[in-house]
């Protein structure tokens, strides 16, 4: 996975 998507993954895990 590219670094640009890591924050999006964390957000999805929190929701």
UniProtKB/Swiss-Prot annotation:
Keyword Glycoprotein found: yes
An annotated Gene Ontology molecular function: galactose binding
One BP annotation, GO: defense response to fungus
Cystine pairings recorded for this chain: none
Record's function text: Lectin that binds strongly to galactose, lactose, D-raffinose, L-rhamnose and cellobiose, and less strongly to D-glucose, D-xylose and L-arabinose. Does not bind D-galacturonic acid, D-fructose, D-mannose, D-ribose, L-sorbose, maltose and sucrose. Has hemagglutinating activity towards human type O and rabbit erythrocytes. Has strong antifungal activity against B.cinera with an IC(50) value of 1.2 uM, and weaker antifungal activity against D.turcia, F.oxysporum and Colletorichum sp. Lacks antifungal activity against F.oxysporum and M.arachidicola.
Name assigned to this protein: Antifungal lectin AMML
UniProt entry keywords in alphabetical sequence: Antimicrobial, Fungicide, Glycoprotein, Hemagglutinin, Lectin, Plant defense
Other information: Hemagglutinating activity stable when incubated at 65 degrees Celsius for 30 minutes. Hemagglutinating activity is reduced by 50% when incubated at 75 degrees Celsius for 30 minutes and is abolished by incubation at 85 degrees Celsius for 30 minutes. Hemagglutinating activity is stable between pH 4.5 and 7.5, but is completely inhibited by incubation below pH 3.0 or above pH 10.
Post-translational modification: Glycosylated.
Subunit (UniProt): Homodimer.
